[in-house]
Amino acid sequence: MTIAHVAWVVPCFDEATRLDRAAFLALTEGCAPASVIFVDDGSRDGTLALLNDLAQARPGQIEVVALAKNQGKAEAVRQGMLRALAGPAGIIGYLDADLATPPAELQRLVELARSSDLDVLLGSRVQLLGRAIQRSSARHYVGRVFATCASLSLGLPVYDTQCGAKLFRRTQALAAALAEPFTSRWAFDVELLGRLAHPPSGVDPIAVARMHEEPLRIWSDVPGSKLHPLAAVRGGLDLLRLALKTRLGR
């Protein structure tokens, strides 16, 4: 049986001091056959040089997409996923450059995606006994409010839309969802799920039965996050707009 090639998209903006070279090199081996597509989002430090060095260390496995100017995480992810769709990947995912979800967990998600018929697989930060989810109380509670609003706006029982570890099977719905830039910079994860569940006419939607949230065993906040407190407010406004768009029809 052919093992599906997985492509991980990693958006990067000024990550030169946080990027774990060894961990990403190991990720390409642990998820093999796999590739990593780094998208440099107009970084102002040495990020692009570091990424190019990584690509030289793993030719054919690590690729760099360099955006001329900063366009935001949403567009960086979209551009990376479009590049992945142009390649051999049967499964395409994205993750945060800080590896808050560690490589071992990412490999576990890949194995689950490969061994199932799921079209959407989301890592979910659920604090349970026996799990090591290290997240500040403030972020946890703000995140719960946001996630509840996201679930209501989508009309889907999703627990955690913002965890930076997601996998998608190559489908017509995924290609359609990525065809146009996201309208939201702050809630693009939610917008992507909405596009998959409510695609344009003529495209089969992704059924809820083929979406799955997998509780992570390990996840930890990494110092140096660029998320501004106002992002939660902007994200909330974006959710309201997305909810109205869904209710009024696409």
What are these regions (language model features)?
Residues P33-S43, V65-A66:
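Short beta-strand/loop segment that forms part of the nucleotide-sugar
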Residues H5-A7, S35, E191:
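Cell-envelope/extracellular polymer assembly enzymes that use nucleotide-activated donors
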Residues D14-E29:
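Short, well-formed alpha-helical segments that are part of the catalytic scaffolds
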Residues T17-R21, D45-L54:
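Acidic helix N-cap motif at the loop->helix transition within catalytic regions
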Residues D40-A49, L99:
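A conserved acidic beta->alpha catalytic loop
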Residues M1-I3, A179-R250:
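Hydrophobic helical membrane-anchoring modules
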Residues L67-A86, I91, P103-W186, V222-L227:
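Acceptor/aglycone-binding surface of glycosyltransferases and processive sugar-polymer synthases
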